[in-house]
């Protein structure tokens, strides 16, 4: 991509020269219900206006967000992306991780919601049953879109130029062995999510218990009712009138499962991050060891 | 008099309205002549009293009649029986007698009976003729009546001397007296009782008519009091007689001498009364229009009254002849003035002036100290009374007067050891004022002083603490203390233990918060003390406040029976110890008293005192370098964030909506005067610094511990506030200093920490406030060094393989043994996984502690474990609903016993369900 901006909540518009998902038309930002969103939309409009001003051919194909140690799988992102994708089918969200990039490898990923998830979100029903019916799991929430970065030749030339001029030290960021901080942070975040997950499960558990308890009560009630009716029948009295059982036993509110799905997705991202990171670091450590042995 | 003491003591709750009611009731009858003033119910209450009195007196007269009959037929046995009944009846009528004075007919029968018995006893012939029963009864009765009459001696002698003394004053007495003169006449006697009764029943109207005749506008109340005084005069004179025991002639002579002035003086008194009443009326004028007419009638007299004021001053000349009589007048006058107390229209200032005039008169006439003391008591009472509202405080001039007055009173009391002062002296009979040989005056000096102390507190509370005025008022404190000291000396001689306890407490309350600089100085320079100049020696001679506290408190511990005084004394004692850095004594006393357990049941002022004491204890511990104790002592006060309120040093604005006006007033009254305040900033600083010294090493040690608890919430709060700051400038406030210091300490940088804690700003704000500032600072530096060393080791031990103790001692500027001991302690407590290598003086790290990542991984594993378990439960639930399918397989990894049981239970349930 030719140009990019950092910071959450800004909009990305891909100019027509950019490869990637090409869109048909401009999309609206969706219904902005939060202040952040409002800012987002304002920024978007501003951007659009500016682009039109300089007479650039442009298409609105999504938005982007920067992230902190890969913690981006959130409700806000889901909602935003859903509204984008709802309006413009081809919309993507670009996730940019500045910390990882600073460590030497450009971290830029494009995501889309899976059609299944789109369905669920359209229904706005996140109850356990609905999710089960949709047969959706955290693995199938987002689909990654491969990114190909194409720059104009002039920029390529500039890049080459710059690379030659840059100091040697800048390049060796890649080989840094001081990794514990990054790993620690990741672990910490992962731990927090695990905690959340745990709580969520407890909540679900309580719900299950309550439901089953109620089922039992309901059952007992029915049985008692039946017995009584039998007795009444034997005495020749009219049976008791049928009562609305759903009124007597209000089923407990099922907890929304979308959050736990999101958390699971987030945990997954973290795990992948850590895996990736440790794999790289192990390689680096072996290299360092070999180097040391060689030196000795 | 008694009225004052009730209002004085329970003044807290009594509103001015109820106070007025209280006063009007007994006085109500006084306005019998002024029908406009007299309301229906007042009359009713009056009637009730009368009837009770009548009933009792009827009983008495009936008994007296039978006794007289028995006397006539010489039936001594009957006499004895009846006499005993009479004694009982009199006992029943006691309350009324107390009010009305001993009835004359009763005195008469006693006197007559005694005479009669003596006659019989003398009559040998008759005695021989008497039967055995009668003779026996005679001797017993004679003994009994002798004993019994001893109580009424004064009355009887006066009666005997002058049976017709007050004949022209009171109709009843007139009747009785004439009866008395013809006491042999039995028939008339019976009749007289009847007439007496009759008279009694129609008393109010009859009396008033009588007095209308006598003087135009005399109040019944003045009449009543006059009555009383007359009884009194009688008793006083007779007392003096009995003292002399010379003979009746002189007494009679004096009686006659007195006789003339009596009437003379009566007129005077009447005049005075008139003047007084007019004055009262004048005050009341604006209030009641109806009264205006009456006022008009008396207009002329009212004019005279203005001239009458000098008349009061002139009066002494008239009195010069007979001292005893003047007693009566003065006291009568006093009572009059007192009657006006508490009434709406009364000009309180004028009242005080009147009383002071009265004292002058009394003093000029050498009326004896008793009267002066009594009047002084009343002046002080009126001074206290001056402000009807509890919230307002005395004006400075009033306050000065009050102090002077109390001082004078004490002068008199010290000069005259034969005066007895007490609350309970006059409760039985109001009219026994000053007659006995040892003067007995009703009034409690202790209550007065306590009230004075209260007033002083009120003045201090209501003065702006930052004004010059406050300083001026504070100068009076010395005077207050002096008075308390004098009263203490006085009560030590005369008072009961309870009174002594109370005054001791008062003394303690004025002593405990003051830092004894002299004693402190002496302590600092014990050897030079002897070589100092004479003057210094004398200065030093004053009792050490510590010794004084010790003495007073011990007395209270031993003698006091009310829990409150002891509690207060203990708290003050602890406070005093703490203030003077006697930490161990203070702590032991606090622990021994077990106050911490039950202080929540105490009343708010005591709780405030307790809080103050705890705070002082904490500060004391801090000065001693006992950070942990300091922190613990201050934790309760500081953690609530309401230190100001808890110490009674100000109201919080926040809770302003929660309380109404009334509560606010009460709380305002509880506030501690400014000069007793504990510096809140100092308090907070001490708390935060001790929290820092505890918390920072602890945080460093448990950096990666998941279950870490904080020692001090408030300290953490401050840290967080500091973190939230977008831009960190150099610290300004005390808190910022502490936060900055904490951050430096976290890195083990003791020098920065030190410079943040101890610098110009902090010195000015906090440290210079300590009496031994330098000592505290030195202690603090050392503490910072030690704790920084610990923090450093906790934080960076994982970096080192080994570290030389010498380096450490250089880094933290501690001597080697200290470093050694600190590290050893850490090793022993298993805080530091290391060992000491003695020959090289190094600390060798064991590296058994997991690294940060390892710790995190462990925590994560733990969390995942619980996650799995939770997840299993969900599954288990499903499995339960679908009927125990996986039961056998699952047991394999179920370790939790309780969990298994629950699972089993569920399976059972599900099985029954299906």
From Swiss-Prot, chain B:
Bias type Acidic residues, positions: 166-190, 217-232, 291-300
Bias type Low complexity, positions: 8-21
Chain positions found as Phosphoserine: 9, 11, 13, 15-16, 18, 39, 166, 178, 181-182, 910
Gene Ontology terms, MF aspect: RNA binding; translation initiation factor activity; translation initiation factor binding
GO cellular component, one term: eukaryotic 48S preinitiation complex
Composition skew (Basic and acidic residues), residue ranges: 199-216, 261-278, 887-900
Record note on quaternary structure: Component of the eukaryotic translation initiation factor 3 (eIF-3) complex, which is composed of 13 subunits: EIF3A, EIF3B, EIF3C, EIF3D, EIF3E, EIF3F, EIF3G, EIF3H, EIF3I, EIF3J, EIF3K, EIF3L and EIF3M. The eIF-3 complex appears to include 3 stable modules: module A is composed of EIF3A, EIF3B, EIF3G and EIF3I; module B is composed of EIF3F, EIF3H, and EIF3M; and module C is composed of EIF3C, EIF3D, EIF3E, EIF3K and EIF3L. EIF3C of module C binds EIF3B of module A and EIF3H of module B, thereby linking the three modules. EIF3J is a labile subunit that binds to the eIF-3 complex via EIF3B.
Domain PCI: 674-850
Cellular compartments annotated: Cytoplasm
Name of this protein: Eukaryotic translation initiation factor 3 subunit C-like protein
Protein task: Component of the eukaryotic translation initiation factor 3 (eIF-3) complex, which is required for several steps in the initiation of protein synthesis. The eIF-3 complex associates with the 40S ribosome and facilitates the recruitment of eIF-1, eIF-1A, eIF-2:GTP:methionyl-tRNAi and eIF-5 to form the 43S pre-initiation complex (43S PIC). The eIF-3 complex stimulates mRNA recruitment to the 43S PIC and scanning of the mRNA for AUG recognition.
Region ranges (Disordered): 1-44, 157-302, 523-543, 886-914
Keyword Lipoprotein belongs to the record: no
PTM annotation: Phosphorylated. Phosphorylation is enhanced upon serum stimulation.
Species assigned in the record: Homo sapiens
Source species, domain of life: Eukaryota
Phosphothreonine carried by residues: 525
Entry-annotated residues carrying N6-acetyllysine: 99, 644
Keywords: Acetylation, Cytoplasm, Initiation factor, Phosphoprotein, Protein biosynthesis
GO biological process: formation of cytoplasmic translation initiation complex; translational initiation
InterPro entries assigned to the protein according to its UniProt record, in alphabetical order: EIF3C, EIF3C_N_dom, PCI_dom, WH-like_DNA-bd_sf, WH_DNA-bd_sf
């Amino acid at each position: 991509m030719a140009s990019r901006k950092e910071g959450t909540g800004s909009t990305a518009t891909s100019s027509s020269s950019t490869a990637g998902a090409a869109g048909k038309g401009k999309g609206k930002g969706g219904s902005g219900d939060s202040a952040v969103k409002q800012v987002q939309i304002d920024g978007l409009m501003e951007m659009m206006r500016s682009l039109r001003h300089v007479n650039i051919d442009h298409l609105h194909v999504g938005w982007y967000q920067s992230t902190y140690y890969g913690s981006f799988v959130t409700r806000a992102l889901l909602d935003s992306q859903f509204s984008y994708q709802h309006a413009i089918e081809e919309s993507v969200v670009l996730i940019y991780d500045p910390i990882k990039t600073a460590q030497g490898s450009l971290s830029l990923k494009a995501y889309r919601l899976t059609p299944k998830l789109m369905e669920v979100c359209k229904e706005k029903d996140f109850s356990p049953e609905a999710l089960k019916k949709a047969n959706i799991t955290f693995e199938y929430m987002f689909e990654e879109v491969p990114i190909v970065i194409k720059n104009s030749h002039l920029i390529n030339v500039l890049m080459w130029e710059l690379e030659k001029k840059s100091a040697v030290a800048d390049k060796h960021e890649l080989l840094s062995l001081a990794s514990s901080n990054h790993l620690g942070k990741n672990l910490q975040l992962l731990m927090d999510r695990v905690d959340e997950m745990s709580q969520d499960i407890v909540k679900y558990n309580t719900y299950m218990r309550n439901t089953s308890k109620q089922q039992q009560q309901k059952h007992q009630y029915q049985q008692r009712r039946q017995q009584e009716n039998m007795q009444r029948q034997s005495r020749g009295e009219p049976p008791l009138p049928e009562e609305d059982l759903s009124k007597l036993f209000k089923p407990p509110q099922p907890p929304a499962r979308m959050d736990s799905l999101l958390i699971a997705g987030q945990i997954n991202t973290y795990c992948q991050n850590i895996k990736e990171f440790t794999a790289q670091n192990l390689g680096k450590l072996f290299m360092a060891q070999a180097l040391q042995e060689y030196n000795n | 008099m008694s009225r004052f003491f009730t209002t004085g003591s329970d003044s807290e709750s009594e509103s001015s309205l109820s106070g007025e009611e209280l006063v009007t009731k007994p006085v109500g009858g006084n306005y019998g002549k002024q029908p406009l003033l007299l309301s229906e119910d007042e009359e009713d209450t009056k009637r009730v009293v009368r009837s009770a009195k009548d009933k009792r007196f009827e009983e008495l007269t009936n008994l007296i009649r039978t006794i007289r009959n028995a006397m006539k037929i010489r039936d001594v046995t009957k006499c004895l029986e009846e006499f005993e009944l009479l004694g009982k009846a009199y006992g029943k009528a006691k309350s009324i007698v107390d009010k009305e004075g001993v009835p004359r007919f009763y005195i008469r029968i006693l006197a007559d009976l005694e005479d009669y018995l003596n006659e019989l006893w003398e009559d040998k012939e008759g005695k021989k003729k008497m039967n055995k029963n009668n003779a026996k009864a005679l001797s017993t009765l004679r003994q009994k009546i002798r004993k019994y009459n001893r109580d009424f001696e004064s009355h009887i002698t006066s009666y005997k001397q002058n049976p017709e003394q007050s004949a022209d004053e009171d109709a009843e007495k007139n009747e009785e007296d004439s009866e008395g003169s013809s006491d042999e006449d039995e028939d008339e006697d019976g009749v007289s009782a009847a007439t007496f009764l009759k008279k009694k029943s129609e008393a109010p109207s009859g009396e008033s008519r009588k007095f209308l005749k006598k003087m135009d506008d005399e109040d019944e109340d003045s009449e009543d009091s006059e009555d009383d005084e007359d009884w009194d005069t009688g008793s006083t004179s007779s007392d003096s007689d009995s003292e002399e025991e010379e003979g009746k002639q002189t007494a009679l002579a004096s009686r006659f001498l007195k006789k003339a002035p009596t009437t003379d003086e009566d007129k005077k008194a009447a005049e005075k009364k008139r003047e007084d009443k007019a004055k009262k009326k004048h005050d009341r004028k604006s209030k009641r229009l109806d009264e205006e007419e009456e006022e008009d009638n008396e207009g002329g007299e009212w004019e005279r009254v203005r001239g009458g004021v000098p008349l009061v001053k002139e009066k002494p000349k008239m009195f010069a002849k007979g001292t005893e009589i003047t007693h009566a007048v003065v006291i009568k006058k006093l009572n009059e003035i007192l009657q006006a107390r508490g009434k709406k229209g009364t000009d309180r200032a004028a009242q005080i002036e009147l009383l002071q005039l009265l004292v002058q008169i009394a003093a000029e006439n050498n009326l004896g100290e008793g009267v002066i003391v009594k009047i002084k008591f009343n002046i002080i009472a009126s001074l206290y009374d001056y402000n009807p509202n509890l919230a307002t405080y005395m004006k400075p001039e009033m306050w000065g007067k009050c102090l002077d007055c109390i001082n004078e009173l004490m002068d008199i009391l010290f000069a005259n050891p034969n005066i007895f002062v007490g609350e309970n002296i006059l409760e039985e009979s109001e009219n026994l004022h000053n007659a006995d040989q040892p003067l007995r005056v009703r009034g409690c000096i202790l209550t007065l002083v306590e009230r004075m102390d209260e007033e002083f507190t009120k003045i201090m509370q209501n003065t702006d603490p930052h004004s010059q005025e406050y300083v001026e008022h504070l100068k009076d404190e010395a005077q207050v203390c002096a008075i308390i000291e004098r009263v203490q000396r006085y009560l030590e001689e005369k008072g009961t233990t309870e009174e002594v306890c109370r005054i001791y407490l008062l003394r303690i309350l004025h002593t405990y918060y003051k830092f004894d600089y002299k004693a402190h100085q002496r302590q600092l320079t014990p050897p030079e003390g002897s070589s100092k100049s004479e003057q210094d020696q004398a200065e030093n001679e004053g009792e050490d406040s510590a010794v004084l506290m010790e003495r007073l408190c011990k007395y209270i511990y031993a003698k006091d029976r009310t829990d409150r005084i002891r509690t207060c004394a203990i708290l003050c004692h602890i406070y005093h110890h703490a203030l003077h850095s006697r930490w161990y004594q203070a702590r032991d006393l606090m622990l021994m008293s077990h106050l911490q357990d039950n202080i929540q049941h105490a009343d708010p002022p005591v709780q405030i005192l307790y809080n103050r004491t705890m705070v002082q204890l904490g500060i004391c511990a801090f000065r001693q370098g006992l950070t942990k104790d300091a922190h613990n002592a201050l934790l309760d006060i500081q953690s609530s964030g309401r230190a100001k309120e808890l110490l009674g040093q100000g109201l919080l604005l926040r809770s302003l909506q929660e309380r109404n006006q009334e509560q606010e007033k009460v709380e305002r009254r509880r506030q501690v005067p400014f000069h007793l305040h504990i510096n809140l900033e100092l308090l907070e600083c001490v708390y935060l610094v001790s929290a820092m010294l505890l918390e920072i090493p602890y945080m460093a040690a448990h950096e990666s511990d998941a279950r870490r608890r904080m020692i001090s919430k408030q300290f953490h709060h401050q840290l967080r506030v500091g973190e939230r700051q977008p831009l960190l400038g150099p610290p300004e406030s005390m808190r910022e200093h502490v936060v900055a210091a904490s951050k430096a300490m976290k890195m083990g940088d003791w020098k920065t920490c030190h410079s943040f804690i101890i610098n110009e700003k902090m010195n000015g704000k906090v440290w210079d406030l300590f009496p031994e500032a330098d000592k505290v600072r030195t202690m603090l530096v050392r503490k910072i060094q030690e704790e920084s060393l610990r923090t450093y080791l906790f934080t960076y031990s994982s970096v080192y393989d080994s570290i030389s103790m010498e380096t450490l001692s250089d880094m933290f500027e501690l001597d080697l043994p200290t470093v050694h001991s600190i590290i050893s302690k850490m090793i022993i407590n298993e805080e530091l996984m290391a060992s000491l290598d003695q020959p090289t003086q190094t600390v060798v790290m064991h590296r058994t502690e997991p690294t940060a990542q390892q710790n995190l991984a462990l925590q994560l594993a733990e969390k995942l474990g619980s996650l799995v378990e939770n997840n299993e439960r969900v599954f288990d639930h499903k499995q339960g609903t679908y009927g125990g399918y996986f039961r056998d397989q699952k047991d394999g990894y179920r370790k939790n016993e309780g969990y298994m049981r629950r699972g089993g239970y569920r399976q059972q349930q599900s099985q029954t369900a299906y």
